[in-house]
Amino acid sequence: MTKLREDIRNVAIIAHVDHGKTTLVDELLKQSHTLDERKELQERAMDSNDLEKERGITILAKNTAVAYNGTRINIMDTPGHADFGGEVERIMKMVDGVVLVVDAYEGTMPQTRFVLKKALEQDLVPIVVVNKIDKPSARPEEVVDEVLELFIELGADDDQLEFPVVYASAINGTSSLSDDPADQEHTMAPIFDTIIDHIPAPVDNSDEPLQIQVSLLDYNDFVGRIGIGRVFRGTVKVGDQVTLSKLDGTTKNFRVTKLFGFFGLERREIQEAKAGDLIAISGMEDIFVGETITPTDAVEALPILHIDEPTLQMTFLVNNSPFAGREGKWVTSRKVEERLQAELQTDVSLRVDPTDSPDKWTVSGRGELHLSILIETMRREGYELQVSRPEVIIKEIDGVQCEPFERVQIDTPEEYQGSVIQSLSERKGEMLDMVATGNGQTRLVFLVPARGLIGYSTEFLSMTRGYGIMNHTFDQYLPVIPGEIGGRHRGALVSIDNGKATTYSIMSIEERGTIFVNPGTEVYEGMIIGENSRENDLTVNITKAKQMTNVRSATKDQTAVIKTPRILTLEESLEFLNDDEYMEVTPESIRLRKQILNKAEREKANKKKKSAAAE
């Protein structure tokens, strides 16, 4: 008879971005009294990174533990976005079941689908929590049917299809086993009880030889590299001599210097851990994800964890613009390279490859969001850098060149569906499904080449007047579609001079396109200051001041009225980029520029390119 550790449950929480997963975990922490009463719980307690709190997305997987009626429930928070899919797969290895959180109105979404597929493939036991049941537009019955359909589509087995459902409103701290909002009670007990009753307890084989697999990495200045993982069997104590089986097949011996267990949101030092525990372990500097820790006299590595390959790459380079070094703290190639290498310590879905120049690196990741978060994080830390336009990674599969395709789900008011369908068809998208969801809304599902989506979201938002919602996630690699897809249809307005932008110049340039800078902004030759309304690039002088001829004209300029400029965010700037442009990123500014700043040199290079293409 297999012994079980009935005092532990290991679960992962899965949800689409913004379906209330982090709020739900906060409520579980609060109601299990795991957090110290004196400490006021911050909202979104599990999102520790500023960017996560601002954007309402979870990037790094977090783990926390709550105690309920003598059982310890280890909860792994998963990123809801497929760009962070590398993390998702590894978390699934650490748990025995998943809690799927779905919005009672929105239902299942593409990212939910990605994460859920990974969970079902690992034979994990699912529980469904229908959240936001208090919404006036909630449609719990239909949503549960949608979840069931999704499970069937993803190949769930019969046991997985018998999932229990709990209805909740995490923000109000209520839950119930009934789908009637009137039956909600101010307690999370139904969720706790369902987890304990349905999620299997880990096997207790703590008397067998030790096996721990590292699923996540962390870094701490005091103890160095920390491996986070599950004890699959055996017992480990501080001071033990153990062996690390590396990914390349070699082994290294080390001594366990510290062990940490998870309590609430804290890590606390512990002296020993047994099979079924989730722990953090230190003592080995070059420990990596997927490696196995075993006793020195019984080395037996677990199968290596597969990590999703990157699908998108871009060039990162040292800032060499005329304004380089003005606003950032870290500007040299050595500092930028050190920072990228440090990111590799914890982000295993990222790749950084050197190029033929010491000032440039090819950085590959899982998608635009993955890379833009890295750029934004570096910018906040005081780095200056430039990046090129993102491009997809082409892979050879069975001798055929293949490119990544994404599954796109769009919710839009009916009147815009025609333009959305047309625009995605132009980007070589194939429509898989179209459903009227009521209230004049339509849901469209497409399969689109990933390069067709680079730069699409800005166009999509203006096309649907901001009412459309688009979600997309990597689907598969398919043979490359020949020809250009997507890209910008309009040229850039490029500054021909150095100086400050003036209201007088902006007034005369406005009719040529959309301006990106305010009067008084410093510009340099070759900097992009707007978007042309035509296809070609146009060089303009935005620094020209009005010639004053007499006293009366001096005040006349003050009445000049110009349109509010369109200030681009980091994501919009990335989307705007063309192949011959860079985005310059500093702690204070985001600027777009031509790779070749001088107009005459640019024209010479373009001529060369055209004649080479004609040959």
Residue ranges and their predicted role:
Residues M1-E615:
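Structural and coupling elements of P-loop NTPases
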